[in-house]
Amino acid sequence: MSTTHDNLILAGDIGGTKVNLGVFRAGKTKPLTVIRPETFPSRSAPDLETHIEQFLDRHHIAQAIKSACFGLAGPVIKGRAKATNLPWIVSETNLQKRFGWPKVKLINDLVATALAIPLLNSTALLALNRARADRQGHLAVVAPGTGLGKALVAVGTNQMVPVASEGGHVGFAPANQAQVRLWRFLHQLFGHVSQERVLSGTGLVNIYAWLRDAEAMEPAAAVEKALETAEYNAAPTITEKALAHQDTICQRALTVFVEIFGAIAGDWALSTMARGGVFLGGGIPPKILPVLRTGDFMTAFCAKGRFSKVVANMPVRVILNDRAALLGAARYALMS
């Protein structure tokens, strides 16, 4: 690969299940272009540095990288982060020492996703309602995947400022009697029942376990087999069986999941007054589009009592581009 006249950026989207790495070419008059994207299972290496080293060696581009930025699922404090769902501690200082890049930045993965939103075209977004965006309104991002992430993009005069949060770890508020029973079931297991316990890949498995163990629904053989291997393997199986209408407990689990998703997204939209739009990111939303479009999501999203009309006028979009966070990380490296 020729790199003579390129300003090459290494970007990463570091999640609990997978690591996305990509090299971007940045020109003064051209948009960011990814030229070497690759995905790895997160736990296939002992740390992020090993993933990066293998990636650079495979593509023979270590010397061409001028800057790097990594969006990581977890709080980033003073250039250092402990991954929420991985046994990794990552720091800008250690990365710079190991690889010798002039510039290295760590940011929250939802900040990376938020930074990508202005760069996404219409084919990368799916509308769940007909509300129109206020160009001066804030943007909200809610992203269930291995965990649950949230971010705000504060919009001011001629600027957009992404703000990280750990809102996925606030308490889960049940919206009906069935969800109260779910909360009680999880409270016995975990004590504090965060939103991530019900709105994530693991959250879907938790809902399934509640239906099986506390609501006396017949277990699904395929899910039970997946659970024997590893808990994180069960969520895709539940989703697959539910979307194919092959198992009642899986269908019910996904319905409850979507209702909770709508309520939590609506809460975040109202908390941030996201008149510029609510964007659903993460790995799960694109995989469950048929159930997101049934109306259950938007009904729960808008069920905000006296403020129902306020949230109903906020546009809701699903991010379909699975490299959005990677693109946002590259954009941050270019900006900084």
Model-derived features: where do they sit?
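ATP-binding/phosphotransfer module of carbohydrate and carboxylate kinases, centering on a glycine-rich
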Residues: 1-60, 64, 181-336
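Short glycine-aspartate micro-motif
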Residues: 9-13, 65-69, 105, 131, ...
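Residues on a specific face of well-ordered alpha-helices
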Residues: 50, 93, 109-112, 146, ...
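Short beta-strand-loop/turn "lid" adjacent to the catalytic site in phosphate-handling enzymes
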Residues: 59-106, 111-124, 141, 286-290
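ATP-dependent carbohydrate kinase catalytic cores
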Residues: 77, 103-134, 228-258, 263
